[in-house]
Amino acid sequence: MAHLHPYPLGRLTSRILSELAAEGPVLDFPRAKLVRGPGGRDWSTTLHGTKVATPLGPAAGPHTQLAQNIVLAYLGGCRIFELKTVQLMDELVIPRPCIDVRTVGFNVEWSQELKLEQSLEEYVKASMLLEVLAASGHLGLDPGFERFAFDLSVGYDLKGIQHERVQAFLHGMLDATKVIDRLRPELPKPYRDLPFRKCISDTLTLSTFHGCPPGEIESITRYLMEDVGLHCVVKLNPTLNGPTEARRLFNEVLGYRYRIPDAAFANDPTFEQAVDLVTRLEATAKKTGRGLGVKFSNTLVVENEGDFLPASEKSQYLSGQPLHVLAMNLVARFRGVFGDRLPISFSAGIERHNFPDAVALGLVPVTVCTDLLLPGGYARASTYFQELAT
């Protein structure tokens, strides 16, 4: 995977608008794959009280770090954008290659590839660009189909999240006025004075280390709701299935040979612990007036066989189709405990054929990583809506 370099807002905007006017591909996104709306249907939903045009989005991952990533997903009909997880340690040396999607998905890359300050600017740029696109009229969107929401993600421990640099990032997303005003002069004159949204996001999905104890997860979520004022979604691990059930589903039912190490279960919450912590957090959410949900699921730790990703990494993180079954099993179990009162976000092996079923289950948002990293990229999203309409 190549190193990432932010593209100046002015040049990016000029390119997008000129390519739209020329009625050809936009950022190499095929014109025929543009999703302009439901054509009389209603695909809209809400995210913590914010109405959005569709429940689909890119999951937090390597493809949600740069402003142009978000624009491309928007062209494909995505309207809920899970932004790449950021953390205090933003100068990590990431082993490369760090992603393998030859069959299912594997990665050894678990944090942002930009500095915190760069990530803030990229997300603000992305929000501004989407508003410029809607204002331009070039996309020919159905009424209301421009509505979108950004969902933050931070990690990986309370000490890091409380650091002043991460705090500056969070508060910059809650009120981006300074960044917006600094970027306005880069825009073409007709768009400089648009009333851009100042709150880029007030919702957050918490990402924690594999092996993060339940007490730490609870402390972080309480802090984010009580002190920062964010709606929170707690991303949970497929290890909640427990070692016996996880291995039965993964190795016996699905037939995958990869080994889930005992260490993957060592410090992760059990299902019962997760139920208890979510129950307590429901009370915190009610007290603070914030929204609370859970997300299924994080990646699955498996042993790295060293045939593609660096052999120096003893573990790799699995995503894609096999994760779908493990995560859906947890959705069923959580629904058995909480009914429909607890919103569930879902990202695990979603592709065009199972997307309609996930939507029918009332999962919001339904987000995608591995499938969008395959040939066709963000344009693959348009096929999801073709399936949803049939």
Placement of each model-derived feature along the sequence:
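Short beta-strand/loop segments at the ligand-binding rim of alpha/beta enzyme cores
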Residues: K51-G57, G289-L292, F334-S347
